[in-house]
UniProtKB/Swiss-Prot annotation:
Record keywords: Calcium, Cell cycle, Cell division, Chromosome partition, Cytoplasm, DNA condensation
Protein biosynthesis keyword on record: no
InterPro entries recorded: Chromosome_partition_MukF, MukF_C, MukF_C_sf, MukF_M, MukF_M_sp, MukF_WHTH, WH-like_DNA-bd_sf, WH_DNA-bd_sf
Tree of life domain: Bacteria
Name of the featured protein: Chromosome partition protein MukF
Function: Involved in chromosome condensation, segregation and cell cycle progression. May participate in facilitating chromosome segregation by condensation DNA from both sides of a centrally located replisome during cell division. Not required for mini-F plasmid partitioning. Probably acts via its interaction with MukB and MukE. Overexpression results in anucleate cells. It has a calcium binding activity.
Assembly and interaction partners: Interacts, and probably forms a ternary complex, with MukE and MukB via its C-terminal region. The complex formation is stimulated by calcium or magnesium. It is required for an interaction between MukE and MukB.
Cell compartments where the protein resides: Cytoplasm, Nucleoid
Pfam families: KicB, MukF_C, MukF_M
Gene3D superfamilies: Chromosome partition protein MukF, middle domain (1.20.58.590), MukF, C-terminal domain (1.10.225.40), Winged helix-like DNA-binding domain superfamily/Winged helix DNA-binding domain (1.10.10.10)
Leucine-zipper as annotated region, ranges: 208-236
Species the sequence originates in: Escherichia coli O1:K1 / APEC
Length: 440
């Protein structure tokens, strides 16, 4: 997030000195949200004490609280929010008793978290990324032009620090809010499945698909602009390499690169985690259906029998011929009728016979390594054999070669516990992982 210039002890001492504290029970938080909502409808952003009392009255009615002490409780709530720096109070000698109230940055931040930031908008994210791209391009152009220290502060450092970094923080906040929404969706799905999983399947599917779509939309938007943003950051970084006095710009660019990498990386990781959860839910539903279908059928049958006299029913069944009534014996009996007698050159040779012949040949050829005590590199040997056979036979031939090779001896490197390197054995992507056999 944003960079802090103070140390932890300084911040702790500062908070203790100013007696900062926030206490917002659900009714007070609702009051603050009501104030923020009504305040957003006003052009001047100001509210009188009477308007605050009216807002408190709506909240009090919603919580079914007594109306006899509305004035006192509203006054206490307003004073408490002023004390907690959620509201600013402005009084005037000309209008004594008619104070004006405005939300503080803290109050706006809290209400934004609960109201405005909850809504994900691809258009908003696209606009933010468009603004960032424009700012980065102008900063990169200014960096390549070069200039004095004022030029670097004004045209490079300032846009990066006060525009690009803040928008990156806003995007990061959006991702963190999406994390909370995912957790809320998981809780909703758990509650639905615990109540009645059969009725909840459609609702679960809707929640899963909506969340997956939102995450994918967010990530696609980020990835589409990510390369261009990184390219402009690299341009600025290249321009600062020849200046020893621009460490502050170089450090800021490095921080922005780290933020952008973290944002894009977490977006993809969040999608992967959600896909795993999606599969877990579907597996649970399938398991529940498999376990429950027999019980449900028995229950419905029992209920139908019990209510037969009130709701009579008829059972109709059909005994159709089997569509797949074919057996190996029947095929063998009809084999001669279909194929007739074949010449000896076209007689079918079973694969087992071919395998035995091939294994004997390979065993005889590999025995040379044992006789001469020459190390046997499986990767090279298998590749040499596969080059002599068509692609369709590669798997079977490779298995035979490996089976015969491991009978000759072992690799001393196997006892080190270190994995062997993967070696390609054909031109189609097949690989083998094995140490060189050197002990027969």
């Amino acid at each position: 997030m944003s960079e802090f210039s103070q140390t932890v002890p300084e911040l702790v001492a500062w908070a203790r000195k100013n007696d900062f504290s926030i206490s917002l029970p659900v009714d007070r938080l609702s009051f603050l949200l009501a104030v923020a909502t009504l305040n957003g409808e006003r052009l001047d952003g100001e509210m009188s004490e009477g308007e605050l009392v009216d807002a408190f009255r709506h909240v009090s009615d919603a919580f079914e609280q007594t109306s006899e002490t509305i004035g006192v409780r509203a006054n206490n709530a307003i004073n408490d929010m002023v004390r907690q720096r959620l509201l600013n109070r402005f009084t005037s000698e000309q209008a004594e008793g008619n104070a004006i109230y405005r939300l503080t940055p803290l109050g706006i931040g809290i209400t934004d978290y609960y109201i405005r930031q909850r809504e994900f908008s691809t258009l908003r994210l696209s606009m933010q990324l468009s603004i960032v791209a424009g700012e980065l391009k102008r900063a990169a152009d200014a960096a390549e032009e070069g200039g004095d220290e004022f030029h670097w502060h004004r045209n490079v450092y300032a846009p990066l620090k006060y525009s690009v970094a803040e928008i990156f923080d806003s995007i990061d906040l959006t991702q963190r809010l999406m994390d909370e929404q995912q957790q809320q969706v998981k809780d909703d799905i758990a509650q639905l499945l615990n109540k009645d999983w059969r009725a909840a399947i459609s609702s679960c599917e809707l929640l899963l698909s909506e969340t997956s779509g939102t995450l994918r939309e967010l990530q696609d938007t980020l990835e589409a602009a990510g390369d261009k943003l990184q390219a402009n950051l690299l341009r600025i970084q290249d321009a600062t390499m020849t200046h020893d006095d621009l460490h502050f710009v170089d450090r800021l660019v490095f921080d922005l690169q780290s933020k952008l990498d973290r944002i894009i990386s977490w977006g993809q990781q969040s999608i992967d985690l959600w896909i795993g959860y999606d599969r877990h839910v579907h597996k649970f539903i399938r398991t529940a259906i498999d376990m429950d279908k027999n019980r449900v059928f028995a229950q419905r049958l029992r209920q139908s029998v019990q209510t037969y006299f009130d709701e009579p029913w008829a059972l109709t069944y059909a005994n159709a011929d089997r569509l797949l009534d074919m057996r190996d014996e029947e095929m063998v009996l009809r084999d001669e009728e279909v194929t007739g007698e074949l010449p000896e050159d076209l007689e079918y040779e079973e694969f087992n016979e071919i395998r035995e012949q091939l294994a004997a040949i390979i065993e005889e050829q590999l025995a040379v390594y044992k006789t001469r005590q020459v190390p046997l590199d499986l990767g090279l040997v298998v590749r040499e054999y596969l080059s002599q056979y068509p692609r369709a036979r590669h798997f079977d031939v490779a298995r035979i070669v490996i089976d015969q090779a491991v009978r000759l001896g072992v690799a001393q490197a196997d006892f080190t516990g270190l994995p062997a390197k993967w070696q390609p054995i054909n031109d189609y992507g097949a690989k083998v992982q094995a140490h060189v056999i050197d002990k027969y």
